[in-house]
Design a protein with these regions (language model features):
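Contiguous segments within soluble domain cores/interaction surfaces
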Residues: 17-119
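Hydrophobic h-region of N-terminal signal peptides that target proteins for export
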Residues: 7-17
Length: 119
């Protein structure tokens, strides 16, 4: 039984879990936040040392009604070091939670801001 326990322990060490990246995430819409059109969001991400994340970092923007699971998620594409653009489309008006998730290797950080979406 001990060899099995040792193997399971080693396997657990090999499977890397995500850890907090402590990234600084700033984002804002660059157009009117409204329904049925793609709304561009500028996203800026720096690591804990203040260095911009590379353009190939995995940055996602998700939209959800507050307290609910995301309705849609879009990939933000890199336009420069630490600079990304995402264009979600809001299906209805009202208050929406916009969450940006930035990932680099096994580091991940999320930030959520609520926006009022016009019709």
């Amino acid at each position: 039984m001990k060899p099995i326990a040792v193997l399971l322990f080693i396997a657990g060490l090999l499977i890397a879990a995500d850890r907090e990246g402590n990234f600084k995430i700033r984002f804002e819409p660059t157009a009117k936040v409204q329904t049925q059109v793609e709304v561009p969001f500028d996203v800026h991400v720096e690591d804990a040392l203040g260095k911009p994340l590379p353009m190939n970092a995995d940055v996602q923007l998700a939209i959800a009604l507050p307290g609910r699971t995301p309705e849609a998620s879009v990939k933000a594409w890199g336009v420069g070091p630490g600079e990304f653009i995402a264009k979600p489309q809001f299906p209805s008006d009202g208050q929406w939670a916009v969450t940006v998730t930035a990932r680099r290797r096994d580091e991940v950080t999320q930030r959520t801001i609520n926006f009022i979406v016009a019709e």
